[in-house]
């Protein structure tokens, strides 16, 4: 067992039952929210989840859903991308619009448009794949090191894979997926460190 896995498990041990329950349902709830939008706008689920993932950087979850719903409404009513003002970067807005306008045929085609590892993993987590998002918080948990997001070092491909493997191993010890473990520890970490 790696030190990363031990640290993740140490954080998990501090999680309340409510935090564990939240971790077990967060991505399923997110998928359900996306499915509701897919039904509302008569769009494939993978496209809606791709839009949500694209609009996620620097965006709070509640606002992310509002922004995605607004963009889907503009798109399906024949509007223009310039009418959309999500709480994220313009490049991410344009990426979300690109997913809508190119109508990718499957999840992997959406992931190709998303490109970035963090948002691609977020996309796959919502779709139900057993991966996890490695962001600054996930790094802090695995390193047992509270830092601001600006202080977290760059997470390269090798480190991302090591951390994902560690979350997967920690999850398996408790009958959870990697993303369920990551979600549960993230909620516990937020409480413990008042983040």
What are these regions (language model features)?
Residues 1-195:
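HhH-family (HhH-GPD) DNA N-glycosylase catalytic core used in base-excision repair
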């Amino acid at each position: 067992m790696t030190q990363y896995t031990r640290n993740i498990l140490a954080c998990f041990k501090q999680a309340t039952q409510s935090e564990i329950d939240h971790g077990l349902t967060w991505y399923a709830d997110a998928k359900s929210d996306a499915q509701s939008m897919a039904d509302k706008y008569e769009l494939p689920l993978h496209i809606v989840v791709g839009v949500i993932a694209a609009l996620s950087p620097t965006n709070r979850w509640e606002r992310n859903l509002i922004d995605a719903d607004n963009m889907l409404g503009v798109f399906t009513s024949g509007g223009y991308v310039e009418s959309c003002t999500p709480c994220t970067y313009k490049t991410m807005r344009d990426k979300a619009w690109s997913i809508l306008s190119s109508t990718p045929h499957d999840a992997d085609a959406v992931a190709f448009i998303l490109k970035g590892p963090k948002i691609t993993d977020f996309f796959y987590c919502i779709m139900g794949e057993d991966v996890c998002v490695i962001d600054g918080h996930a790094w802090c948990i695995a390193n047992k090191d509270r830092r601001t997001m600006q202080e977290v070092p760059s997470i390269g491909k090798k480190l991302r894979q090591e951390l994902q493997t560690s979350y997967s191993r920690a999850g398996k010890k408790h009958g959870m997926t990697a993303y369920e473990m990551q979600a549960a520890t993230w909620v516990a970490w937020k409480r413990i460190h008042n983040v």
